[in-house]
Regions:
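AMP-binding/adenylate-forming catalytic core of the ANL superfamily
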Residues: 22, 38, 43-44, 66-151, ...
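A short, polar/charged loop-to-alpha-helix boundary motif
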Residues: 179-181
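A diffuse structural propensity rather than consistent per-protein peaks
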Residues: 5-8, 62, 93, 135-136, ...
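Conserved AMP-binding/adenylate-forming
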Residues: 1-74, 81-84, 97-98
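General small-molecule cofactor/ligand-binding pocket signal
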Residues: 156-159
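Short acidic/His-enriched helical or mixed secondary-structure segments at domain edges of catalytic enzymes
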Residues: 164
Length: 181
């Protein structure tokens, strides 16, 4: 069986699990924190005990990614743990919203972050660069037809180009700073 959105199955000698924030294994097709261990997996970071404490727990390495394993053992990446938005007590994965926005023919790039909210704890904000004109209300309507209501961005900010690092990856911390200024 082939799963084009999967990164594949774990290699021989590496155990991969999807776990809750309490380190409890989750059932198949449930999004959670990825952890893995094996003979070739380090037990810590060299000369960095603070980072080691954050990333290693009871012999498992936590790379900071969210994902799920299907029934066949294929791993699907769903985003970064630190990027997860908790809105009204519900975990929301920005990657799903970003992919939805990217499916609109007018959108060139998209990044989703959170902003504090008195009502929900966190609210969803999307930063978008366009390749064709579209209004923020039309993009929000597009999201409403493709996402659950609680995943629809409250605000869409347009930019000519999203900030990127030297590797071409969008720098969400810069977007957060721009939003708070």
């Amino acid at each position: 069986m082939h799963f084009p959105d999967s990164v594949g199955r774990p290699i021989f000698g590496v155990d991969v699990q999807i776990v809750s924030e309490e380190h409890q294994p989750l059932s198949a097709n449930t999004v959670g924190r990825i952890r893995y261990k094996g003979m070739a997996v380090s037990s810590g970071f060299y000369n960095d005990p603070e980072s080691s404490l954050e990333s290693f727990h009871e012999g498992w390495f936590y790379p900071g990614d969210l994902g799920l394993l299907n029934e066949e053992g294929y791993l699907f990446l769903k985003g970064r743990f630190k990027d997860m938005i908790i809105r009204g007590g519900i975990n929301i994965y920005p990657l799903e919203i970003e992919n939805t926005l990217m499916n609109n023919h007018c959108v060139s790039e998209a990044a989703v972050i959170s902003t504090p909210s008195k009502e929900f704890g966190e609210e969803i904000v999307a930063f978008v660069s366009l390749k064709a004109p579209i209004s923020s209300s039309d993009l929000i309507d597009f999201c409403k037809t493709h996402l659950a209501p609680y995943k629809v961005p409250k605000l869409i900010q347009f930019m000519d180009q999203l900030p990127k690092n030297s590797g071409g990856k969008i720098v969400k911390s810069q977007l957060s700073k721009m939003l708070n200024n």
